[in-house]
Amino acid sequence: LTCLICPEKYCNKVHTCRNGEKICFKKFDQRKLLGKRYIRGCAATCPEAKPREIVECCSTDKCNH
């Protein structure tokens, strides 16, 4: 599995996940509309969203755009 790993909206930096990491995720703060920073990466399970945070998980290559 390969996931995107950069914080910008348009990301093309790809990371190969380790064994056991079968999920790509993207999370961001729903309050910040301007200058939004995304946290992307690989995970074994989908990270839990904190208050006012949006987390999206998927399981195909580069799906966390």
Curated annotation (Swiss-Prot):
Tissue specificity field: Expressed by the venom gland.
Database matches in Pfam families: Toxin_cobra-type
Annotated disulfide bonds: C3-C24, C6-C11, C17-C42, C46-C57, C58-C63
Additional facts recorded: Negative results: does not inhibit GABA(A) channel composed of alpha-1-beta-3-gamma-2 (GABRA1-GABRB3-GABRG2) subunits.
Family: Belongs to the three-finger toxin family. Ancestral subfamily. Orphan group II sub-subfamily.
GO MF annotation terms: acetylcholine receptor inhibitor activity; ion channel regulator activity; toxin activity
Gene3D superfamilies: CD59
Role summary: Binds to muscle and neuronal nicotinic acetylcholine receptors (nAChR). It binds to extracellular domain of rat alpha-7/CHRNA7 nAChR (IC(50)=2.2 uM) and to Torpedo californica membranes (IC(50)=30 uM).
Organism of this sequence: Naja oxiana (Central Asian cobra)
InterPro entries: Snake_3FTx, Snake_toxin-like_sf, Snake_toxin_con_site, Toxin_cobra-type
GO cellular component: extracellular region
SUPFAM superfamilies, per database record: Snake toxin-like
Protein's UniProt name: Oxiana weak toxin
Keyword Endoplasmic reticulum: no
Keyword line: Acetylcholine receptor inhibiting toxin, Disulfide bond, Ion channel impairing toxin, Neurotoxin, Postsynaptic neurotoxin, Secreted, Toxin
Locations listed in the record: Secreted
